[in-house]
Amino acid sequence: MSKRMHSHSIAWRKRVIDKAIIVLGALIALLELIRFLLQLLN
């Protein structure tokens, strides 16, 4: 495995992790919003 390929795979993994964090954050925000709306209805 060449050095360039290795650094590329690390950058790719970091990008995937960043995307996963964004998706998780969006899901949590959505759940908070739903909980807030349910409280308003009750």
Curated annotation (Swiss-Prot):
It comes from the Bacteria. It is a single-pass membrane protein. It is found in: Membrane. NCBIfam families: toxin_DinQ. This is Uncharacterized protein DinQ. InterPro entries: DinQ-like. The chain crosses the membrane at residues 21-41. Belongs to the DinQ family. GO terms for cellular component: membrane. Disulfide bonds: none annotated. The gene is dinQ. It comes from Escherichia coli (strain UTI89 / UPEC). Its main location: membrane. Keywords: Membrane, Transmembrane, Transmembrane helix.
